[in-house]
């Protein structure tokens, strides 16, 4: 009898709508983490391009160079992966079909940004890193416009 009562009560309740980027209904989304990671990719790409190999055969100089180069590459790849993860969270968890009506190029923009993240992981290419920042800014602008706000993208570097 009690089960029937509970079931009849539950049947009359409309389902709760939740919005979340995680497995909890927090509803907290912000493209700031995407910008920080993408900006780190650009910064590390610039550092890698500027890094000069030693002109001598001194093993200590080469060890220092190799260590610095390896660290820069590791950070660049890690941040490209983080950028992609954050972009995909916005795409799969925040953006809804209604956003596609207003921003019909959203899927293409996200797809290109994700592809650029992969390209930036495997290449040391300033043009690709700058293009990634450009796409991150597009996503930033779409995100805030979808919330009825116009927040300027402020770079840390």
Label every model-predicted segment.
Residues 86-103:
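Short, solvent-exposed, charged loop/turn and helix-capping segments
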Residues 68-78, 82-89:
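Structured binding/interaction patches within domain cores
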